[in-house]
A protein has these predicted regions:
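Positively charged n-region of N-terminal signal peptides that target proteins for export
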Residues: 1-4
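Bacterial N-terminal signal peptides
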Residues: 7-16
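Carbohydrate-active catalytic/glycan-binding domains of CAZyme proteins
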Residues: 18-169
Length: 169
């Protein structure tokens, strides 16, 4: 009985220390319109900025990189690529995949570099990995690899990069 009473007193004293009031901040908030379609977005943080990338479907240049300090106000600072040129299927004349864009990008910051992984949405089904030290600067193609549908980069201290995915057959 004494142990039960001691337990209840302990719980009661802990609960008395909890505040029942909520802190609210009054104000008007407005989410400004981004004049773009921003599906499948991916966000990473580096320093005081957040960086976001999204699918561009059929638009070139592709892989818009946007920057924000507050996750509300965004500015486009670069594009990962102007056009895809490593396969003749991406040519505008007689091409078959150029108009289908790049899908489900993933952006990450690791050890002073930014990494972007994305896939075009048609044959030849190969994923691209780009890198840049300055996300507002020039992006360089690091690798073309097996196609991964809606993949995401996962960076570790012991490896440059790693990806997770469901392979497309």
């Amino acid at each position: 009985m004494k142990k039960m009473m001691l337990a209840w007193l302990t719980v009661a004293s802990l609960l008395m220390g909890c505040s029942g009031s909520e802190t609210s901040v009054k104000g008007t908030y407005r989410n400004p319109v981004i004049y773009a379609d921003v599906p499948d977005m991916s966000v990473t943080r580096a320093g005081e900025y957040y960086y976001m990338i999204s699918t561009t479907m059929h638009l070139m240049p592709g892989g818009p990189v946007m920057r924000s300090k507050d996750l509300v106000n965004w500015e486009t600072v670069s594009y990962v690529f102007d056009k895809l040129t490593d396969n003749s299927k991406y040519d505008l004349i007689g091409g078959t995949v150029y108009g289908r864009g790049q899908w489900a990008s993933s952006i990450r910051y690791h050890n002073g570099k930014f990494y972007v992984l994305f896939s075009p949405n048609d044959v030849p089904y190969r994923s691209y990995i780009f890198t840049a030290e300055d996300p507002a600067g020039k992006w360089e193609l690091l690798s073309r690899t097996q196609h991964f549908h809606d993949a995401s980069l996962f960076l570790m201290m012991t490896a440059e990069y790693m990806y997770s995915m469901e392979p497309v057959s």
